[in-house]
């Protein structure tokens, strides 16, 4: 099984919140915490579907069933690879793939940074998704918005 865990995820930039408020035509700041929550959720969901980092983050892939290759996501750079006992494992990273010497259990820790071009391309989808969340849209609507990321 392979599992992706969030270790740390940065908050959206204040400019993203302002862009979202403009997109959603929010007239005041009374709902700011709710809007920020919707924006944070939307950014994380869109970055995972698009496989492009929108928020800086630190992640861990735990893999015990792999063929000696583990994928990292969203343009991640590997920080460490350890075995089940926390000992370092040698690896080579090429793009989004981490090549290992064995298929034993590993934990691959990596960091992500937003790419400005991807951020600009995906921000409209984020705003649309966050607005749909804020408006209480159903899963079918939310999923149709995410299709724009592919």
Regions found by a protein language model. Give the residues of each.
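Divalent metal-cofactor coordination and adjacent catalytic microenvironments
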Residues: 1-150
